[in-house]
Curated annotation (Swiss-Prot):
Pfam families: Ribosomal_L6 (PF00347). It comes from Chlamydia trachomatis serovar D (strain ATCC VR-885 / DSM 19411 / UW-3/Cx). Signal peptide: none annotated. This protein binds to the 23S rRNA, and is important in its secondary structure. It is located near the subunit interface in the base of the L7/L12 stalk, and near the tRNA binding site of the peptidyltransferase center. Keywords: Ribonucleoprotein, Ribosomal protein, RNA-binding, rRNA-binding. This is Large ribosomal subunit protein uL6. Belongs to the universal ribosomal protein uL6 family. One of its GO terms (biological process) is cytoplasmic translation.
Length: 183
Protein backbone atom coordinates (compact mmCIF):
# COMPACT_ATOMS: atom_id res chain seq x y z
CA UNK A 1 0.00 0.00 0.00
CA UNK A 2 1.16 3.52 -0.74
CA UNK A 3 2.33 5.14 2.48
CA UNK A 4 1.59 8.66 1.30
CA UNK A 5 -1.93 7.72 0.23
CA UNK A 6 -2.81 6.70 3.78
CA UNK A 7 -2.81 10.38 4.74
CA UNK A 8 -5.64 12.66 3.60
CA UNK A 9 -5.01 15.51 1.18
CA UNK A 10 -5.56 18.76 3.09
CA UNK A 11 -7.31 21.44 1.03
CA UNK A 12 -5.91 24.96 1.41
CA UNK A 13 -8.16 28.00 1.85
CA UNK A 14 -10.10 28.78 -1.34
CA UNK A 15 -9.84 25.34 -2.96
CA UNK A 16 -13.00 23.29 -3.57
CA UNK A 17 -13.28 19.65 -4.64
CA UNK A 18 -16.41 18.16 -6.19
CA UNK A 19 -17.07 14.62 -7.41
CA UNK A 20 -19.68 13.91 -10.09
CA UNK A 21 -20.16 10.46 -11.62
CA UNK A 22 -16.62 9.27 -12.37
CA UNK A 23 -14.94 12.71 -12.50
CA UNK A 24 -13.24 14.81 -9.84
CA UNK A 25 -13.11 18.57 -10.26
CA UNK A 26 -10.80 20.88 -8.30
CA UNK A 27 -11.39 24.66 -8.32
CA UNK A 28 -9.13 27.28 -6.85
CA UNK A 29 -7.90 30.86 -7.25
CA UNK A 30 -5.76 30.03 -10.31
CA UNK A 31 -8.38 28.00 -12.21
CA UNK A 32 -9.97 24.57 -12.30
CA UNK A 33 -8.87 21.06 -13.30
CA UNK A 34 -10.80 17.84 -13.85
CA UNK A 35 -9.66 14.21 -13.82
CA UNK A 36 -11.51 11.05 -14.78
CA UNK A 37 -11.48 8.51 -11.94
CA UNK A 38 -10.84 4.80 -12.31
CA UNK A 39 -13.34 2.33 -10.92
CA UNK A 40 -10.62 0.83 -8.70
CA UNK A 41 -10.48 3.88 -6.42
CA UNK A 42 -12.98 5.66 -4.15
CA UNK A 43 -12.71 9.34 -3.25
CA UNK A 44 -14.37 10.89 -0.19
CA UNK A 45 -14.40 14.59 0.74
CA UNK A 46 -14.85 15.33 4.46
CA UNK A 47 -14.54 18.96 5.46
CA UNK A 48 -11.27 20.28 4.08
CA UNK A 49 -9.73 16.83 3.55
CA UNK A 50 -9.84 14.41 0.63
CA UNK A 51 -9.49 10.68 1.32
CA UNK A 52 -8.38 8.22 -1.37
CA UNK A 53 -9.14 4.53 -0.77
CA UNK A 54 -9.09 1.49 -3.03
CA UNK A 55 -12.49 0.11 -4.01
CA UNK A 56 -13.71 -2.99 -2.18
CA UNK A 57 -13.51 -5.21 -5.27
CA UNK A 58 -9.80 -4.52 -5.89
CA UNK A 59 -7.70 -7.45 -4.72
CA UNK A 60 -4.53 -7.21 -6.84
CA UNK A 61 -2.17 -4.70 -5.18
CA UNK A 62 -4.66 -1.95 -4.33
CA UNK A 63 -1.96 0.46 -3.14
CA UNK A 64 -0.70 1.14 -6.65
CA UNK A 65 -3.88 2.75 -7.93
CA UNK A 66 -4.48 4.44 -4.58
CA UNK A 67 -1.04 6.07 -4.63
CA UNK A 68 -1.46 7.17 -8.25
CA UNK A 69 -4.76 8.94 -7.66
CA UNK A 70 -3.54 10.42 -4.38
CA UNK A 71 -0.62 12.02 -6.25
CA UNK A 72 -2.82 13.18 -9.16
CA UNK A 73 -5.33 14.85 -6.84
CA UNK A 74 -2.58 16.38 -4.65
CA UNK A 75 -0.98 17.86 -7.79
CA UNK A 76 -4.34 19.24 -8.93
CA UNK A 77 -4.86 20.90 -5.54
CA UNK A 78 -1.37 22.41 -5.57
CA UNK A 79 -1.79 23.54 -9.18
CA UNK A 80 -5.03 25.47 -8.67
CA UNK A 81 -3.72 26.99 -5.43
CA UNK A 82 -0.08 27.96 -6.18
CA UNK A 83 0.66 26.66 -9.70
CA UNK A 84 3.74 25.01 -11.15
CA UNK A 85 6.82 26.49 -12.81
CA UNK A 86 9.73 25.07 -14.78
CA UNK A 87 12.69 27.23 -15.74
CA UNK A 88 15.04 26.44 -18.61
CA UNK A 89 18.34 28.11 -19.39
CA UNK A 90 19.99 28.28 -22.80
CA UNK A 91 23.77 28.03 -22.91
CA UNK A 92 25.59 28.66 -26.16
CA UNK A 93 26.82 31.44 -28.41
CA UNK A 94 23.88 33.07 -30.18
CA UNK A 95 21.27 31.03 -28.32
CA UNK A 96 18.20 33.13 -27.54
CA UNK A 97 14.47 32.80 -27.13
CA UNK A 98 11.48 35.09 -27.60
CA UNK A 99 7.72 34.79 -27.20
CA UNK A 100 5.75 36.00 -30.23
CA UNK A 101 2.02 35.75 -29.56
CA UNK A 102 1.27 32.06 -29.02
CA UNK A 103 4.65 30.88 -30.36
CA UNK A 104 7.98 30.33 -28.62
CA UNK A 105 10.75 31.31 -31.04
CA UNK A 106 14.10 29.60 -30.36
CA UNK A 107 17.42 30.45 -32.00
CA UNK A 108 19.52 27.43 -31.07
CA UNK A 109 22.39 27.30 -33.52
CA UNK A 110 20.59 25.88 -36.54
CA UNK A 111 20.09 27.56 -39.92
CA UNK A 112 16.44 28.41 -39.22
CA UNK A 113 14.59 29.65 -36.12
CA UNK A 114 12.61 26.96 -34.32
CA UNK A 115 9.02 27.96 -33.55
CA UNK A 116 6.99 26.00 -31.02
CA UNK A 117 3.27 26.58 -30.38
CA UNK A 118 2.56 27.28 -26.71
CA UNK A 119 -0.23 24.99 -25.40
CA UNK A 120 -3.33 26.67 -24.01
CA UNK A 121 -3.26 26.94 -20.24
CA UNK A 122 0.46 27.73 -20.09
CA UNK A 123 2.16 31.06 -19.55
CA UNK A 124 5.62 31.29 -21.11
CA UNK A 125 7.96 34.22 -20.52
CA UNK A 126 11.57 34.89 -21.48
CA UNK A 127 14.03 36.77 -19.28
CA UNK A 128 17.43 38.01 -20.48
CA UNK A 129 16.90 36.24 -23.87
CA UNK A 130 18.27 32.96 -22.47
CA UNK A 131 16.04 32.10 -19.50
CA UNK A 132 12.65 30.53 -20.30
CA UNK A 133 9.97 30.35 -17.60
CA UNK A 134 6.97 28.03 -18.11
CA UNK A 135 4.05 28.40 -15.66
CA UNK A 136 0.68 26.70 -15.41
CA UNK A 137 -1.77 24.88 -13.15
CA UNK A 138 -1.43 21.45 -14.81
CA UNK A 139 1.81 19.80 -13.67
CA UNK A 140 1.83 17.29 -16.53
CA UNK A 141 1.36 19.98 -19.19
CA UNK A 142 4.09 22.22 -17.70
CA UNK A 143 6.58 19.34 -17.47
CA UNK A 144 5.75 17.97 -20.92
CA UNK A 145 6.19 21.33 -22.67
CA UNK A 146 9.44 21.99 -20.77
CA UNK A 147 10.72 18.56 -21.86
CA UNK A 148 9.76 19.29 -25.50
CA UNK A 149 11.66 22.60 -25.42
CA UNK A 150 14.70 20.92 -23.84
CA UNK A 151 14.58 18.11 -26.43
CA UNK A 152 15.08 20.63 -29.25
CA UNK A 153 18.71 21.05 -28.14
CA UNK A 154 19.64 18.93 -25.08
CA UNK A 155 22.91 19.83 -23.35
CA UNK A 156 25.91 18.11 -24.88
CA UNK A 157 28.57 16.62 -22.58
CA UNK A 158 31.71 18.24 -24.03
CA UNK A 159 31.05 21.98 -23.81
CA UNK A 160 27.69 21.92 -22.04
CA UNK A 161 25.93 23.86 -24.81
CA UNK A 162 22.19 23.41 -25.18
CA UNK A 163 18.93 23.90 -23.31
CA UNK A 164 18.83 22.60 -19.75
CA UNK A 165 16.62 22.88 -16.71
CA UNK A 166 17.72 25.54 -14.26
CA UNK A 167 20.20 24.03 -11.79
CA UNK A 168 20.44 20.80 -13.82
CA UNK A 169 23.79 19.09 -13.51
CA UNK A 170 25.30 18.09 -16.86
CA UNK A 171 27.98 15.44 -16.63
CA UNK A 172 30.96 16.63 -18.63
CA UNK A 173 33.35 14.46 -20.63
CA UNK A 174 36.98 15.08 -21.43
CA UNK A 175 37.75 15.99 -25.02
CA UNK A 176 40.27 14.26 -27.24
CA UNK A 177 43.70 13.96 -25.68
CA UNK A 178 46.49 15.63 -27.63
CA UNK A 179 49.13 13.37 -29.17
CA UNK A 180 52.48 13.45 -27.45
CA UNK A 181 55.87 12.34 -28.64
CA UNK A 182 57.70 12.53 -31.97
CA UNK A 183 56.51 11.14 -35.27
Amino acid sequence: MSRKARDPIVLPQGVEVSIQNDEISVKGPKGSLTQVLAKEVEIAVKGNEVFVTPAAHVVDRPGRIQGLYWALIANMVKGVHTGFEKRLEMIGVGFRAAVQGSLLDLSIGVSHPTKMPIPTGLEVSVEKNTLISIKGINKQLVGEFAACVRAKRPPEPYKGKGIRYENEYVRRKAGKAAKTGKK
